[in-house]
């Protein structure tokens, strides 16, 4: 387990004194105190960031203000969220929040719902429309042009996702007209980061939120959101490919660089604003290939 806290100078000093007998040397110049307590390491950085890593990370971190997350025990009466497109240069960013009740369990089992990464695109395109029809959800689709505008306004790759997850949950709660027992987000950042960014947002859900790694493997609501988001992303990529006249690949690899370079040569650099996430490194690589 890996837990990150931001502590004051006094708290860092107290921690260092408490675990001084466990202190070891660190080669990292930015670590001012390093200790190994059993199978758990404690790294205190000059910035005040403290990283607890190992089997007792949660226990030790709780001594300095960390509050352990309560993992929901039920699959139902729960909202789950997931996003797709954040790792792809071409195409937009899709975030979906879905609500699963007891009445949906049989249907979801029949559909063979699982994390979208474990399903073929063909399978996703088969079952996603049925999920969209049956499962209460809110899907937010941010086209590349809007994405670039939001990033230019001061958001970053993490804060834009926080804003979208937060808004999708808020809108779904309003749609349901009642609070779910739990909300689970497939973790894409630390809890501290999420809280920092979400505090700047206007609307906030009423139910407590839990961020979990690989939540799509644990909760059907997250898996449903994963599938719907992937479907929306594939549809968006298909639409943009048709509009541009180029087959736009998913992902952010060499093929994306080459296709982007072809678009630049054919339509000019400005054409990418409608098709791709410009802050990705692919933009500079494509410009180099296109010899701009």
From Swiss-Prot:
Keywords: Cytoplasm, Endonuclease, Hydrolase, Magnesium, Metal-binding, Nuclease. GO terms for cellular component: cytoplasm; ribonuclease H2 complex. It comes from the Bacteria. Residues 76-292 form the RNase H type-2 domain. Its EC number is 3.1.26.4. Belongs to the RNase HII family. RnhC subfamily. This is Ribonuclease HIII. The gene is rnhC.
């Amino acid at each position: 387990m890996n837990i990150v806290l931001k502590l004051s100078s006094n708290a860092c000093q107290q921690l260092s004194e408490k675990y001084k007998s466990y202190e070891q040397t660190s080669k990292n110049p930015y670590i001012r105190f390093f200790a190994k307590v059993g199978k758990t390491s404690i790294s205190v950085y000059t910035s005040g960031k403290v990283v607890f890593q190992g089997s007792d990370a949660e226990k030790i971190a709780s001594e300095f203000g960390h509050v352990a997350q309560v993992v929901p025990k039920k699959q139902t009466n729960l909202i789950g969220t997931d996003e797709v497109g954040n790792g792809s240069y071409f195409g937009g960013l899709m975030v979906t929040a879905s609500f699963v009740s007891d009445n949906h369990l049989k249907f979801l089992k029949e559909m063979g719902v699982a994390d979208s990464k474990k399903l073929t695109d063909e399978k996703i395109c088969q079952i996603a429309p049925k999920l969209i029809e049956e499962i209460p959800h809110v899907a937010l689709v941010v086209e590349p042009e809007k994405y670039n505008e939001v990033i230019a306004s001061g958001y970053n790759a993490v804060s834009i996702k926080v804003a979208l997850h937060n808004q999708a949950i808020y809108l779904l709660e309003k749609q349901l007209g009642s609070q779910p027992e739990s909300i689970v987000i497939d973790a894409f950042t630390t809890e501290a980061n999420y809280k920092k960014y979400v505090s700047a947002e206007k609307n906030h859900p009423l139910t407590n939120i839990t961020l979990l790694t690989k939540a799509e493997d644990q909760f059907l609501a997250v898996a449903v959101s994963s599938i719907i988001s992937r479907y929306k992303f594939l549809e968006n990529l298909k639409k943009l490919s048709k509009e541009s006249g180029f087959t736009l690949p998913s992902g952010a690899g060499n093929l994306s660089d080459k296709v982007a370079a072809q678009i630049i040569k054919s339509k000019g650099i400005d054409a990418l604003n409608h098709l791709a996430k410009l802050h990705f490194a692919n933009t500079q690589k494509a410009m180099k290939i296109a010899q701009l």
